[in-house]
């Protein structure tokens, strides 16, 4: 009974074969093992077949040997990349794939048949993809006292991808660890929060993204700025603008003042005083033969003008006496007002006597006013 049970277990194992799991990186070469002892007695009846069941459950034939022929171009995806690794007739029916692609991942089955005997072996192939080069970014303003987030992410690669941040030592004595007040987001390991930035936080930071296939990294520089320096720059710019405006205003005022003074100087000679008093009399050249009589007429006219009203005096003073032509002497005398449109009349002896009497009786102040 025990011998029968041992034979049954041996037959079951030999029939179903073993399960093997292999991990390889994409673009590399892999060999899937499959060994048998069924080809030595009778080689003409030997059949070898490799099958692939992908992650979606679809099954396809990869390579076969039958009737002394090898068929290895059965699928378009693996055409020219699959072959038997060794002498399959001697008992090594291992499959070789080069180069590997992510689509090669799945469950491979090696089936060997000869004269009614079967050997099965199963290999689970996992194709690992290296992380793509991550992209390092900064979120926030790198100013003193603020918080800054370092972001790192790979677009492709076999999960899980592990991210690791560190500082790059640029000078002797610099620490490679992150600043003390740094927090890692465990829900998103590619994010690191730098809290309460100081000038010591400035430097070069490196992010490394890695998995079982390999790793890639990126770097980003953090330069912490003083908040005061930003305020000083803003104040300096404001001061420059205000100074420029002030200078422009002063220049404009000076130009305006000069223009006003020039305008006043040009208009000053043309001013006319409206309150100036009109001339009372005009000197003319009388003839020598009638100088005595004109003096008498002048005195008589002055006497008559004294008794007239103020309006007639103004009209009389504005009149002008025309000079007499053909005079030989150069003597001058005061002439009185003339009535428009009429010749001055000669004073009578009686009239002159009355005028002299009137002048003698007038106060001295009045006489002085009349003789002006």
Curated annotation (Swiss-Prot):
Location (main, coarse): other
Pfam hit, one: Ig_3
Membrane topology: Single-pass type I membrane protein
Extracellular side: 18-234
Keyword annotations from UniProtKB, A to Z: Cell junction, Cell membrane, Disulfide bond, Glycoprotein, Immunoglobulin domain, Membrane, Repeat, Signal, Tight junction, Transmembrane, Transmembrane helix
Superkingdom as given in the UniProt entry: Eukaryota
Biased composition (Low complexity): 287-313, 352-361
Ranges per topology, Cytoplasmic: 256-372
Biased composition (Polar residues): 362-372
Compartments, as annotated in UniProt: Cell junction, Tight junction; Cell membrane
Disulfide bonds: 34-110, 152-207
Any single Gene Ontology cellular-component annotation: bicellular tight junction
Biased composition range(s): Basic and acidic residues: 263-280
Induction of its expression: Up-regulated in mature adipocytes and adipocyte tissue of obese animals.
Name of the featured protein: CXADR-like membrane protein
Taxonomic source organism: Rattus norvegicus (Rat)
Gene this chain is encoded by: Clmp
């Amino acid at each position: 009974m025990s011998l029968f049970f041992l034979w049954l277990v041996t037959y079951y194992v030999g029939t179903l074969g073993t399960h093997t799991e292999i991990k390889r990186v994409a673009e590399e070469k892999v060999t899937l093992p499959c060994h048998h002892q069924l080809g030595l007695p009778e080689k003409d009846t030997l059949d070898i077949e490799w099958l692939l069941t992908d992650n979606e459950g679809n099954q396809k034939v990869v390579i076969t040997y039958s009737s002394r022929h090898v068929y290895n171009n059965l699928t378009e995806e693996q055409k020219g990349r699959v072959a038997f690794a060794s002498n399959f007739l001697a008992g090594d029916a291992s499959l070789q794939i080069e180069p590997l692609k992510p689509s090669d991942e799945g469950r491979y089955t090696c089936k060997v048949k000869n004269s009614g005997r079967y050997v099965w072996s199963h290999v689970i192939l996992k194709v690992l993809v290296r992380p793509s080069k991550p992209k390092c970014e900064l979120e926030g303003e790198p100013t003193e006292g603020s918080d800054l987030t370092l972001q790192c992410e790979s677009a492709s690669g076999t999960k899980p991808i592990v991210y690791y941040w560190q500082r790059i030592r640029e000078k002797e004595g610099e620490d490679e660890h992150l600043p003390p007040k740094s927090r890692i987001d465990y829900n998103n390991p590619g994010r690191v929060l730098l809290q309460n930035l100081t000038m010591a936080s400035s430097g070069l930071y490196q992010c490394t993204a890695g998995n079982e296939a390999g790793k890639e990294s990126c770097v980003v520089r953090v330069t912490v700025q003083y908040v005061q320096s930003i305020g000083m720059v803003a104040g300096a710019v404001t001061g420059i603008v205000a100074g420029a405006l002030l200078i422009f205003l002063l220049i404009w005022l000076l130009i305006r003042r000069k223009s006003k003074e020039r305008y006043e100087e040009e208009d000053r000679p043309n001013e006319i005083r409206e309150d100036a008093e009109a001339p009372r009399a005009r000197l003319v050249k009388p003839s020598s033969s009638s100088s005595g009589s004109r003096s008498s007429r002048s005195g008589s006219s002055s006497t008559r003008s004294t008794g007239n009203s103020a309006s007639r005096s103004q009209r009389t003073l504005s009149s002008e006496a025309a000079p007499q032509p053909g005079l030989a002497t150069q003597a001058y005398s005061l002439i009185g007002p003339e009535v428009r449109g009429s010749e001055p009349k000669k004073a009578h002896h009686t009239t002159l006597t009355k005028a002299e009497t009137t002048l003698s009786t007038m106060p001295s102040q009045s006489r002085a006013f009349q003789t002006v």
